[in-house]
């Protein structure tokens, strides 16, 4: 697994400058990790709308890694790592994402909370709030 240069740079933009609300990463067939998409912090103005857009951007039948910058209480933000592995994803892809997860996380310093999600209920705002609190 090789991280494209944009992977770390985009994460640093989220962590240091808070430019992005979320980042979705994809492992390509050549085992290179790329930034598939990111959502800007003030995309729609409302936090709930931005979260919904992020959640709906996760593919229903493919694995992904995602980073989510969440703040339920002003000034108390958490950077969450999400290992997205829907039950309908191909077994080979699930194995690839599972076996590279720890190495990927080590490349991105500053992750505070980790989630493994197989459907959107695993990473609903309520589920995230319960886990963080």
Swiss-Prot record:
Its main location: cytoplasm. Residues 1-133 form the ADF-H domain. InterPro entries: ADF-H, ADF-H/Gelsolin-like_dom_sf, ADF/Cofilin. Gene3D superfamilies: Severin. It is found in: Cytoplasm, Cytoskeleton. Pfam families: Cofilin_ADF (PF00241). One of its GO terms (molecular function) is actin binding. The keyword Cytoplasm applies. Keywords: Actin-binding, Cytoplasm, Cytoskeleton. SUPFAM superfamilies: Actin depolymerizing proteins. One of its GO terms (biological process) is actin filament depolymerization. GO terms for cellular component: actin cytoskeleton; cytosol. Belongs to the actin-binding proteins ADF family. Actin-depolymerizing protein. Severs actin filaments (F-actin) and binds to actin monomers. This is Putative actin-depolymerizing factor 11. It comes from Arabidopsis thaliana (Mouse-ear cress).
């Amino acid at each position: 697994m090789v991280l494209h240069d944009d992977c770390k740079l985009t994460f640093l933009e989220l962590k240091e400058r808070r430019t992005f609300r979320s980042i979705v990463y994809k492992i390509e067939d050549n085992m290179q990790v790329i930034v598939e998409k990111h959502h800007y912090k003030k995309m729609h103005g409302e936090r709930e709308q931005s979260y919904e857009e992020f959640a709906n951007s996760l593919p229903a039948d493919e694995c992904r890694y995602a980073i989510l910058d969440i703040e339920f209480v002003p000034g108390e933000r958490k950077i969450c790592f999400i290992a997205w592995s829907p039950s309908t994803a191909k077994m080979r892809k699930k194995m690839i994402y599972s076996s590279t997860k720890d190495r990927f996380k080590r490349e991105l310093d500053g992750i505070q909370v980790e989630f493994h999600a197989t459907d959107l209920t695993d990473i609903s705002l309520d589920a995230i709030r319960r886990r963080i609190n």
